[in-house]
Design a protein with these regions (language model features):
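Alpha-helix C-capping/helix-to-loop hinge sites
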Residues: 14-21, 39, 56, 90-93
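Compact soluble domain cores
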Residues: 24-42
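Residues at secondary-structure transition points
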Residues: 2, 62-65, 98
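Alpha-helix N-cap and coil->helix boundary residues
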Residues: 6, 24-28, 45, 82, ...
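Arg/Lys-rich, positively charged N-terminal/basic patches that mediate binding to nucleic acids
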Residues: 1-29
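Enriched for short, Lys/Arg-rich terminal
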Residues: 73-113
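Basic/aromatic recognition patch in beta-strand/loop cores that engages polyanionic ligands
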Residues: 41-87
Length: 113
């Protein structure tokens, strides 16, 4: 399967903030992208093409459980081709979860709904 991964503006803004805060973030993000390319079905299925994936932040020293959460939205382009939109990322230490309403707003802000 051919997978294209596209970080959206709402994701980029939060990723930039986390990158300033955690020294290992750039390497952790690269590792996350490689894992996602190898297995596009990572994480928990939230329905409607949405997934929540745990991402470790090495400099926090807490593994995936205390790292970040990435919300993705997958669009199937063709039978063997899909696009994974990186919708949002948040630090698990800053917030425990994200509501369905917030996810819908993120989709709207990025022109996906």
């Amino acid at each position: 399967m051919n997978v294209k991964i596209e970080p959206l503006p709402t994701f980029k803004r939060e990723a930039k903030r986390l990158n300033k805060h955690y020294a290992s973030f750039a390497d952790d993000y690269e590792r996350f992208i490689n894992e996602l390319e190898a297995n596009p079905h990572l994480g928990t299925d939230l329905g409607g093409g949405l997934r929540k994936i745990r991402m470790a932040i090495t400099s926090k020293g807490k593994g995936k459980s205390g790292g970040a959460r990435v919300i993705t939205f997958t669009v199937v382009v063709a039978v063997e081709e899909s696009e994974i939109n990186l919708l949002y990322i948040y630090d698990k230490a800053e917030r425990s979860s994200i509501s369905k309403k917030e996810i819908e707003e993120l989709l709207r802000l990025n022109g996906l709904k």
